[in-house]
């Protein structure tokens, strides 16, 4: 070991420098300064002096205690799943010199024999003896076998545990390696201190016990005490024998003892552990000391096999005595797996039951309510049928319970309907005094516009619907949420298909009609023609004895506009429109879109109550808190009353146009209903797909597969998306069809291009554009992106693309006919017919038919065609030729018909 200075030695030992210097001077060393160097021999001399001064002469340590701690993980199963538990195992081993252990055992036996002579009737007397027997602690520490139960040795064992930890806790790892002598010094001083504290505690306990009167022992007690020292000696004699820890670790019930239990309990076998301990020790307070004494360690020399920990394998589950019957709630549709889960059985059991009933089903396949009820009853449970709309009905009842506000008159909601280009938007434009029609793409309206207009006849709310055929659903929605319909018909064009459709929608919704005959400023205007055509549709003018008002107007000159507004106001007055105020709002979603920067924007029409910022709104499968509201002029508003169209922000997804909305008190309920609606739609979709699969399972065998044009469609608003989807799905036929693999509202993103890449689709954007990343990806992967702003162009291009996918039509054309005049045989070609071309021309390489009495009897090809002795490829009308028909013999009078097959492109 390297030489160190006095200050370094004091630092490593943890003692003051002055104290080390004084101890060195007492030991006869000449060190005076902290910087003096201490050699190994001087350290040994100092250590020997310190040990001799404390009554120790042995230089080596009597025992060494090693500690080890390991941490592992254990996975345990529980009712809710598997759980990982951290397990920490702490091991402590004490190594003691064998010769010292033997000496201490003999010394302990001698002490025990001396006690036998001293023990008389006082119970307190044995407490005084532990002060002399200081060494048995070393014996008890290494050997876990129950040794001595007497009170004399229990306090003696207490320093055994602190003695070793003092070494390991107060010395650092570096000092253990660098200087073993310092360790011994520290250990000696700590041992002396612990011994002094122990003796003081025992003296204190003895004095307290001496103050109490001791009961006189009976004859039985005296006999017990006479027998006790012999028991001690026998236990001490067993110290050297290895033992089994099974009796220590587990009691008769199989339960493990507490590790902190004392030796007074552990060392006595049998159920009466504490009672046996009381036989040895009459002092209950000192018994507590024995019980809490540290667990003794086994000697390394006598170390046996690692004890096997017994764990009770008895589980907590008890098999039910009777079958459990569940009340199974069954909605209108439920999957097989979910039904099995509600009955607490395996899904295979439900599938097996369905197979017995003649139904083939998979785990994820939905089944109807009746089938599920039969399965539940078959398996012995009780079926409880619930309505699919139960949760919605409950929510509506809760909302309806709060509708107690007073009703006030409201403005009429007027929908402008009619055929495309008949002037609907221009008429509304004149009323609003704003230029809207000129801003529409292609001059046609492609969205439902909601406007509130202040007129001389009061406030009116107008809905402007598209007139194109693709926007049938929009017109239907407009009629459903309106009070009065203005049917615009061009005076120079008359009644058109969309005009008839608008009449049908108005009748289906039970909404009164006001007919506006537009374009009266044109010279070709013919209002009587319009009246006649509408009369054929059972729309009779008032001046003809009907109940429908016909107003002649012009959107350009303003002719008849005031009369039209007056007619609408009169019709609304007859309806006596009113709505509740100061109640949760309800209404209908007119339009929705995804706006970059603002999120989901929905145009809603409030039909009752007051819609306020911060309300929780539920619309179809969408819900959210209203973050902001704007009117038709783009101004921020805080409240929207009845008949008010507003744009709202804050929904999670764009709702479907036409969905009814209502304000609910709790966001949790709104989320629950929205998720329920989405799940119901998913189940219905799965059911439709499954039905289609079963019906068409064998339909395609032996037939050509249908060609599919895959499309990813993105639009600016939800209404346009629905209209274009409906129009595209109507284009196809049995051979070709459109498959819309993805659709949505908002700009074209990289996800849309990736979807088109994986499905082999083209990307169509209607009034939207692709972002930079999507354009770059599309260019790299050669994905076609097409933009449109007019619905005609989009539908026409998709239709032409589908037409190009159709198989061409094969058309036969007769190019020539030759009559057989004579037949003769040729050694080279066999039978040859001498013919006269009577019509068209005969070609060598075209297919032929042989006709006999104008009936086709053979179809094949020519083997040879000659004019005199020359092979020719064509013989014209009125010319003789020789024809050899391959694999057929012709007769005189037959006709040989030459035809050609041409492919003609088809169109949808």
Swiss-Prot record:
GO terms for cellular component: cytosol. Gene3D superfamilies: P-loop containing nucleotide triphosphate hydrolases, Putative DNA-binding domain, N-terminal subdomain of bacterial translation initiation factor IF2, Translation factors, Translation initiation factor IF- 2, domain 3. Residues 132-143 have a biased composition (Acidic residues). Residues 409-578 form the tr-type G domain. Residues 464-467 are annotated as: G3. Residues 256-267 have a biased composition (Basic residues). SUPFAM superfamilies: Initiation factor IF2/eIF5b, domain 3 (SSF52156), P-loop containing nucleoside triphosphate hydrolases (SSF52540), Putative DNA-binding domain (SSF46955), Translation proteins (SSF50447). It is found in: Cytoplasm. Residues 443-447 are annotated as: G2. GTP binds at residues 418-425, 464-468, 518-521. Residues 518-521 are annotated as: G4. GO terms for molecular function: GTP binding; GTPase activity; translation initiation factor activity. Residues 122-180, 203-267 are annotated as: Disordered. Keywords: Cytoplasm, GTP-binding, Initiation factor, Nucleotide-binding, Protein biosynthesis. Residues 223-248 have a biased composition (Basic and acidic residues). Residues 157-166 have a biased composition (Low complexity). Residues 418-425 are annotated as: G1. Residues 554-556 are annotated as: G5. Its main location: cytoplasm. HAMAP family: IF_2_B. One of the essential components for the initiation of protein synthesis. Protects formylmethionyl-tRNA from spontaneous hydrolysis and promotes its binding to the 30S ribosomal subunits. Also involved in the hydrolysis of GTP during the formation of the 70S ribosomal complex. Belongs to the TRAFAC class translation factor GTPase superfamily. Classic translation factor GTPase family. IF-2 subfamily. This is Translation initiation factor IF-2. It comes from Saccharophagus degradans (strain 2-40 / ATCC 43961 / DSM 17024).
